[in-house]
Amino acid sequence: MSLHTENSQPSIGVYPGTFDPITNGHIDIIERALALFDTVIVAIAVNGQKQPLFSGEERKEMIEKCFEKEKGRIIVKIVPSGLLVNFAVEQGARAIIRGLRAVSDFDYEFQLALMNRKLVREVESIFLMTAFRWIYISSSLIKDVSKNGGDISDLVPKHVERLLEEKYRP
């Protein structure tokens, strides 16, 4: 059941991240967010402090392929630099969705949520706990394991696994 009612605008949530690459943990959060919102905008953040393995466009295509059946309900956008909360407002979003893997994630995310709330009171932060089976994975760990020839087949979609193999073992 989403936050949408018949007399209101469709509910929109923004799920930001670098998604370099998208993992099954990310997919789990997006699927669960769809139960809360009519539309989920997956916002690919450009982080100047990180050197991504995949271009923004490659990440966009990677994510769209994961959700071909949900076209229209899941929209993937590359976010230009700037405040995420402003992007959320521009998209008509009611909430920023964040996945939490551990208590250590909460400290950082809590600070961001408070700052976003100070900047724009109308946009809520919603925290979804990562499903237990994905709690230990991150995009960085996936890249490291793949680069060193480890098996990531049950941690990412098949097309993502192939793309990683192409990057590391052309």
Curated annotation (Swiss-Prot):
Subcellular location: Cytoplasm
GO cellular component: cytoplasm
GO aspect biological process, one term: coenzyme A biosynthetic process
Xref: Gene3D superfamilies: HUPs (3.40.50.620)
KW DNA repair (keyword) present: no
Catalytic reactions of this protein: (R)-4'-phosphopantetheine + ATP + H(+) = 3'-dephospho-CoA + diphosphate
Cofactor: Mg(2+)
Binding site for substrate: 18, 50, 84, 98
This enzyme's EC code(s): 2.7.7.3
Annotated GO MF terms: ATP binding; pantetheine-phosphate adenylyltransferase activity
Site (Transition state stabilizer): 26
Keywords recorded for this protein, A-Z: ATP-binding, Coenzyme A biosynthesis, Cytoplasm, Magnesium, Nucleotide-binding, Nucleotidyltransferase, Transferase
Subunit (UniProt): Homohexamer.
Protein family per UniProt: Belongs to the bacterial CoaD family.
Name by which UniProt lists this protein: Phosphopantetheine adenylyltransferase
Origin species: Desulfotalea psychrophila (strain LSv54 / DSM 12343)
Record lineage: Bacteria, Pseudomonadati, Thermodesulfobacteriota, Desulfobulbia, Desulfobulbales
